[in-house]
């Protein structure tokens, strides 16, 4: 099969981090990124392992058309004068094309683990004080369009004794507040889970690398399997509306054979677990470069199909499909690049719920929402309504329902009551639906400036800058 050039872009030299020209090309249904530095030679890496899926995602992304508004000037502190160019002048700079969907604040550099796969290389340093963090929260709350939510990260945020205070402060300014955690402190105390939920926490973003000891021993340096299960159980017992998203770092040969089991575990615990967000390993921070460890989003989607009886790779859409939900309660369109993330929803219902401390009944086999809903038709209608600044209606949803619908119509009317514009209504959706997603953060080897310019996950920094996730972790962190 002949080599086909897909598009040309810019990337980074992994050695000197200078911007260099790059191209994506297809060979035998695999897409590669190839680039050459005048000083350090040629580099090549796998970009996407399924060219057909690449084209499907590209078409579905164009269908939504949600990345049109350029929003960097509205950040309040744009880098309007180019010095070194993208991605070195982040602030956001005037070249950035997508609004902040999720804003991240690193509230500590300390950590109670030394994970071999930590992209942040966390473990030392001092914490910013509470007033510095609150000032960042205030600045982020003034971005326009306003971010959909905020995440406290690090390091390990639960090492801060004032985390509940920070959660409460953020909740007064943002509907959605989440904490990125390894779960060690959650496993120690159900009361701690209750304290953070009472303060206003929306969801714990829980590091969760697989089923059984082995993935944790390899990726985290110790067996944390019982810790993860206890963290989930403590939140189940303590929470009025418990919410956890499982976040597996996926490494080839370590836990890529457990993707199906992780999804099944999430579905079986859907009274607490609201989603799974697989993150193919990013080869930066403490993670050493080894091309044999590389996993791409298509690898995750095909594994989900091969390892479950209910999912197909084509059930997934670009992460921009989340705009259907987020914009309904006033958040910005999710304008990320179609190669950045994939998402699907499983219908799990809520019949397995029995309240705090009660037994959970056996749950029926999950079903992808695409079995019952023509998501592409709904997305086309959404894009038209967005362009006309109109709200999506229940009728718009019903027009997209497939004739084979076996679900109660009350479920659909409840699940897609998007016109309410209330965060709690959309949040309640995740008591009946389980999000299954994949988000692949870049490293210096597969870095693509076209993706960076459409990034929607941004760090808020004490100096006032707002920096795209992959630019921050590859270039700006520690500078």
Regions found by a protein language model. Name each.
Residues 2-67, 379-479:
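Flexible mid-to-C-terminal extensions adjoining Fe-S/redox cofactors in radical SAM and related proteins
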Residues 29-53, 58-191, 195:
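Conserved alpha-helical substructure of the radical SAM core
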Residues 37, 82-93, 101-102, 111, ...:
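Functionally engaged cysteine thiol sites
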Residues 107-109, 119-122, 154, 181, ...:
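Glycine-rich, histidine-containing beta strand-loop boundary motifs that form or position
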Residues 121-125, 211-214, 283-284:
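A short, flexible beta-alpha/helix-coil linker loop
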Residues 129, 217-220, 288-291:
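Short, solvent-exposed loop/turn segments at secondary-structure boundaries
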Residues 134-151, 160-280:
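Radical SAM/AdoMet-radical enzyme domain recognition
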Residues 238-428:
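Radical SAM enzyme [4Fe-4S]-AdoMet core and its adjacent flexible, acidic
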């Amino acid at each position: 099969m002949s080599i086909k050039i897909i598009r040309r872009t810019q990337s980074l030299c992994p050695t000197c981090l200078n911007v260099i020209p790059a191209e994506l090309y297809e060979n035998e249904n695999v897409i590669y990124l190839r680039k050459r530095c005048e000083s350090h030679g040629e580099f090549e890496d796998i970009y996407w392992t399924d060219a057909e899926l690449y084209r499907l995602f590209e078409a579905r992304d164009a269908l939504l058309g949600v990345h049109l508004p350029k929003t960097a000037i509205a950040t309040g502190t744009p880098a309007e004068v180019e010095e070194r160019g993208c991605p070195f002048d982040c602030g956001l700079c005037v070249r950035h094309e997508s609004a902040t969907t999720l804003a991240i604040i690193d509230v500590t550099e300390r950590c109670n683990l030394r994970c071999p796969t930590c992209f942040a290389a966390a473990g030392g340093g001092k914490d910013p004080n509470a007033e510095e963090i609150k000032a960042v929260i205030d600045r982020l709350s003034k971005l326009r369009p306003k971010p959909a939510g905020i995440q406290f990260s690090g390091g390990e945020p639960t090492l801060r004794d004032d985390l509940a205070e920070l959660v409460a402060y953020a909740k007064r300014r943002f509907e959605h507040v989440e904490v990125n955690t390894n779960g060690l402190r959650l496993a120690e105390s159900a009361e701690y889970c209750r304290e953070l939920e009472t303060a206003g926490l929306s969801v714990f973003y829980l590091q969760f690398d697989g089923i059984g000891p082995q993935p944790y021993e390899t990726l985290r340096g110790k067996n944390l399997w019982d810790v993860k299960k206890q963290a989930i159980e403590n939140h189940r017992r303590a929470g009025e509306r418990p919410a956890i998203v499982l976040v597996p770092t996926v490494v080839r040969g370590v836990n890529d054979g457990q993707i199906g089991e992780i999804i099944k575990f999430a579905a079986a615990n859907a009274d607490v677990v609201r989603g799974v967000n697989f993150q193919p390993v990013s080869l930066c921070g403490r993670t050493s470069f080894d091309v044999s460890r590389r996993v791409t989003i298509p690898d995750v989607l095909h594994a989900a199909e091969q390892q479950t009886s209910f999912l197909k790779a084509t059930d997934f859409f670009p992460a921009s499909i989340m705009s259907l939900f987020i914009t309904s309660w006033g958040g910005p369109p999710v304008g990320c690049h179609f190669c950045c993330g994939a998402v699907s929803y499983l219908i799990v219902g809520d019949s397995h719920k029995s309240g705090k401390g009660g037994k959970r009944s056996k749950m029926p086999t999950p079903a992808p929402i695409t079995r019952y809903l023509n998501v592409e038709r709904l997305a086309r209608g959404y894009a038209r309504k967005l362009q006309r600044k109109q709200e999506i209606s229940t009728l718009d949803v019903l027009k997209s329902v497939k004739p084979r619908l076996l679900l109660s119509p009350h479920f659909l009317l409840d699940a897609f009551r998007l016109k309410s514009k209330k965060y709690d209504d959309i949040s309640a959706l995740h008591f009946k639906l389980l999000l299954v997603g994949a988000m692949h953060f870049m490293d210096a080897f597969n870095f693509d400036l076209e993706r960076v310019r459409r990034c929607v996950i941004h760090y808020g920094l004490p100096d006032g800058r707002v920096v795209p996730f992959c630019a921050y972790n590859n270039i700006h962190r520690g500078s």
